[in-house]
């Protein structure tokens, strides 16, 4: 089964949105296989956002991600990367569909509540940055037989 990385950013944690976000993914039928609340160290933030290192917004992004706790999650399911990206919505909340997480809970691209891996390759890389092998749990949800053919 596929896995992806999702992070509720400091604004989402501070606004009390973690439970709502987890509930949405669970209600969809995705399986939570890892989760933790952390203040991210600079090295992991830099590694997480390495493609943005040379961009002018990176210093602000780094400061923002390090400004408070983040809720880190590993989710599992068929086609989970694409499913989660649709549920999260467009990066710019002004363009996010109503009903998506960003469409419902974010107003500003610089405070857009949540990060989700954008490809299976990114998911594998990001999961490796934030979770050690033993931190992800393999188990079966009781409803899996009715979720998948």
Swiss-Prot record:
Alphabetized UniProt keyword annotations: ATP-binding, Cytoplasm, Kinase, Magnesium, Metal-binding, Nucleotide metabolism, Nucleotide-binding, Phosphoprotein, Transferase
Q: Which cofactor does it need?
A: Mg(2+)
Native organism is Methanoculleus marisnigri (strain ATCC 35101 / DSM 1498 / JR1)
* Biological role stated in the UniProt entry: Major role in the synthesis of nucleoside triphosphates other than ATP. The ATP gamma phosphate is transferred to the NDP beta phosphate via a ping-pong mechanism, using a phosphorylated active-site intermediate.
Q: Which domain of life is it from?
A: Archaea
Its recorded reaction(s) are:
a 2'-deoxyribonucleoside 5'-diphosphate + ATP = a 2'-deoxyribonucleoside 5'-triphosphate + ADP; a ribonucleoside 5'-diphosphate + ATP = a ribonucleoside 5'-triphosphate + ADP
Query: Record keywords: S-adenosyl-L-methionine included?
Result: no
Q: Per UniProt, where does ATP bind? A: 9, 57, 85, 91, 102, 112
The record's annotation in CDD domains points to: NDPk_I
Q: What is this protein called?
A: Nucleoside diphosphate kinase
| MF term (GO), any | nucleoside diphosphate kinase activity
Pfam families from the xrefs? NDK (PF00334)
């Amino acid at each position: 089964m596929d896995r992806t990385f999702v992070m509720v950013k400091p604004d989402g944690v501070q606004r009390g949105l973690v439970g709502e976000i987890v509930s949405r993914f669970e209600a969809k039928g995705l399986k939570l296989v890892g989760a933790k609340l952390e203040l991210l160290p600079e090295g992991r933030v830099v590694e997480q956002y390495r493609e943005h290192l040379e961009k002018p917004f990176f210093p602000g992004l780094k400061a923002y991600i390090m400004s408070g706790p983040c809720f880190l999650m590993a989710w599992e399911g068929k086609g989970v990367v694409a499913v989660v990206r649709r549920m999260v919505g467009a990066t710019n909340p002004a363009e996010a569909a109503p009903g998506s997480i960003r469409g419902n809970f974010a107003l500003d691209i610089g405070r857009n509540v949540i990060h989700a891996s954008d490809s299976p390759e990114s998911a594998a890389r990001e999961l490796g940055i934030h979770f050690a092998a033993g931190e992800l749990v393999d188990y079966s949800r009781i409803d899996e037989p009715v979720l998948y053919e």
